Amino acid sequence: MILRIFGHDFHYECENLCRVYYPNEKIEIKYDGSGDDPLTVETRLFPEDGGARVEVITSINGSVRSAGDKVTAPEDELRDKCELRIAQLMFELLSAETGYTPPWGVLTGVRPSKLMLRLTAQLGEQGAMDYFTKGLLVSPEKARLAATVAKAEEQIVASSRPNSFSLYVSIPFCPTRCSYCSFVSHSITNSNARKLLPEYLEKLSDELGELGGIARELGLRLESVYFGGGTPGVLEAPQLDRLLCSGESSFDLSSLREYTVEIGRPDTVTPEKLRALRIHNVGRISINPQTFNQKTLELIGRNHTVEQAVKAYQLAKSYDFDCVNMDLIAGLPGESYEDFTASVDTAVALSPENITVHT
């Protein structure tokens, strides 16, 4: 598929919207008329007196559609207005061409509830709903969902003090690298990465000390801690113990509302590590099978079995954590809808306190 961009730099939004309609197509962005493809979307912006003119032309397997409009707005708002109008025109043409109307409208790459909160503060509840449905072309059902989630989030945020903060501690190492992963992480099967881990932990402890000092100087109150990765479970129990001790000596943890360590891979879970977490009052852990389909686990490069994931969860439950979370991923390579729902059913049957679904 070719996406042509003329007169603007909205390529990110335009590309994401094309992917909503054609998720399996490789999209090539061009800023000229070169190339030829049966699937082509052309977007244009021309400056005009008092504003700009935007146009969209779609050529899909010989079917050509076009639409355009003049956009007027104050100079400091014109760019955003043009970007939105191009997205609306793309939505109009591609929905007509494909017969598919995306329920989230032109929203891509954003958190709808966060946007809903901001718009509600600016426009009021009805104004925010109108902007979602009429401006962003979100279906009424999804707009109501965003509003419901936003209200729930608002209650949580409102309970935080103005001087509170959260701490994220990164362990960018994993047993192996999963085929789908885009995070910064190093597999400890690599000897260089394995040698680097102890030094990294030493520097990380130093950094925790520095940050703790800054927090005290600013009078900040630590509200939540999250150890993520990577896979924090790659740490041995003594390493985990020392790192948690560093956190305790660097920060006042008396006001914590949530203390999470994402153990990660089920094959890294051991009684010794779980014991260390409980000793240090970690209340929430995450064990991430990602799928309960053995073929998929092998395909994506995770060296654990479905049985190991279940046993790791059962072991963790025996240590009486406040919350055990399980991560699943929708859309893993080769998985069908039925494969994913089977994984969801398995996770639900285990009854963890929380299930997180990533896409």
List the predicted regions and their residue ranges.
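Short Lys/Arg-enriched alpha/beta "domain-start" segment
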Residues: 1-38
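N-terminal [4Fe-4S]-dependent radical SAM core
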Residues: 97-101, 121-168, 218-219
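Amphipathic beta-strand/beta-sheet edge segments enriched in Tyr/Trp
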Residues: 39-73
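Local cysteine-cluster metal-coordination motifs and their immediate loop/turn environment
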Residues: 169-185
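Conserved non-cysteine loop/helix-boundary elements of the Radical SAM core domain that shape
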Residues: 185-359
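Extended acidic/polar, glycine-enriched regions
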Residues: 69-91
